[in-house]
């Protein structure tokens, strides 16, 4: 009987130490340290607007063509969302191992179970050169903005 009490006491201490809790330990739930800030995020730093020069630069780096106003609007929404995430005050917040705070997760050992299957993997490639995957053949840099068809960014 005392072994069970020690085991539950030790489990409660380990759960408290890691910042995890379970429904079986109501005493630990009162002491649990959460790993996310309780205060609301600060106001965003920018409005998400992107200049035509930045869009051209991103198109050349990412080999993506933002050919419509809808694509530019989607990019601006993504940047505004990233600005909101950047504005969150994370000072004093411990790094998390998992988003599941209520259970202890154990990592599996990293063992190789199969190997030397390069030939099998390369069979899935569209194009192979000397045992290497080749990037998609359409992956060429975009022409500069003055060489492209006119497009108005309305900024």
Swiss-Prot record:
The yes or no answer to whether the keyword Cytoplasm is present is no
What reaction is this protein's catalytic activity?
L-glutamyl-tRNA(Gln) + L-glutamine + ATP + H2O = L-glutaminyl-tRNA(Gln) + L-glutamate + ADP + phosphate + H(+)
Note down the stretches annotated as region Disordered.
27-48
Q: What is its EC number?
A: 6.3.5.-
Keywords, A to Z, come to:
ATP-binding, Ligase, Mitochondrion, Nucleotide-binding, Protein biosynthesis, Transit peptide
This protein's GO cellular component annotations are: glutamyl-tRNA(Gln) amidotransferase complex; mitochondrion
- Please give one Pfam family short name: GatC
Q: Where in the cell is it found?
A: Mitochondrion
Q: Which GO terms describe its molecular function?
A: ATP binding; glutaminyl-tRNA synthase (glutamine-hydrolyzing) activity
What residue stretch is labeled transit peptide in the record? 1-20
SUPFAM superfamilies, per this entry? Glu-tRNAGln amidotransferase C subunit (SSF141000)
Q: What class of enzyme is it?
A: ligase
Q: Which PANTHER family match?
A: GLUTAMYL-TRNA(GLN) AMIDOTRANSFERASE SUBUNIT C, MITOCHONDRIAL (PTHR15004:SF0)
**Its job:** Allows the formation of correctly charged Gln-tRNA(Gln) through the transamidation of misacylated Glu-tRNA(Gln) in the mitochondria. The reaction takes place in the presence of glutamine and ATP through an activated gamma-phospho-Glu-tRNA(Gln).
What family, per the record?
A: Belongs to the GatC family.
* Complex and partners: Subunit of the heterotrimeric GatCAB amidotransferase (AdT) complex, composed of A (QRSL1), B (GATB) and C (GATC) subunits.
Q: What is this protein called?
A: Glutamyl-tRNA(Gln) amidotransferase subunit C, mitochondrial
Please give the organism.
Canis lupus familiaris (Dog)
